[in-house]
């Protein structure tokens, strides 16, 4: 059984860390995905992230394979897989950037009180027994940032 998915939910400190961690996926020769999610916070970008990693993330035209190879041994030809030079966005048909700033939202989650009585729990849609179960509906309220 091999690793099918590697997810980074923050920036690795170095490009070598990224290479090592994403290299775990697909070692058995089967299809695998490596996903990197990050936000550009000043504190994140200022201290611990290497310049090569910053340059890679800022350049939407750089081939991922080329970057990884340049960090290892420097040998890579991007078009060796496709027969022509290509970027990540054209290879996989994805848009390489995310929307600027998503609006934050406050979510409330449903909660149910447990009742350890001998009677069965109330059935959905029935009016009897509804007082025994306290429900709060799930809602999402956008935060506008204005008061």
UniProtKB/Swiss-Prot annotation:
Q: Where is the composition biased (Low complexity)?
A: 125-141
Q: Which domain of life is it from?
A: Eukaryota
Residue ranges of coiled coil: none
Q: Where is this region: Disordered?
A: 100-147
Mind telling me which InterPro entries this protein's record contains? Answer: P-loop_NTPase
Record domain Helicase C-terminal: where: 1-72
Q: What family does the database annotate?
A: Belongs to the helicase family. RecQ subfamily.
Q: What's the stated role of this polypeptide?
A: Truncated ATP-dependent 3'-5' DNA helicase.
Q: What is this protein called?
A: Truncated RecQ DNA helicase-like protein C212.06c
Q: Which organism is it from?
A: Schizosaccharomyces pombe (strain 972 / ATCC 24843) (Fission yeast)
């Amino acid at each position: 059984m091999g690793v099918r998915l590697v997810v980074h939910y923050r920036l690795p400190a170095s490009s070598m860390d990224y290479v090592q961690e994403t290299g775990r996926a697909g070692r058995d020769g089967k299809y695998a995905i490596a996903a990197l999610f990050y936000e550009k916070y000043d504190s994140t970008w200022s201290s611990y992230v290497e310049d090569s990693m910053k340059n890679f993330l800022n350049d939407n035209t750089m081939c991922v394979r080329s970057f990884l190879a340049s960090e290892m041994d420097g040998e890579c030809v991007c078009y060796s897989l496709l027969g022509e030079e290509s970027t990540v966005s054209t290879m996989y048909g994805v848009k390489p950037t995310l929307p600027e700033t998503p609006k934050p939202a406050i979510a409330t989650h449903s909660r149910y009180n447990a009742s350890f009585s001998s009677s069965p729990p109330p059935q959905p849609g029935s009016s009897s027994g509804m007082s025994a179960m306290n429900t709060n509906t799930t809602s999402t309220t956008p935060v506008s940032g204005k008061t």
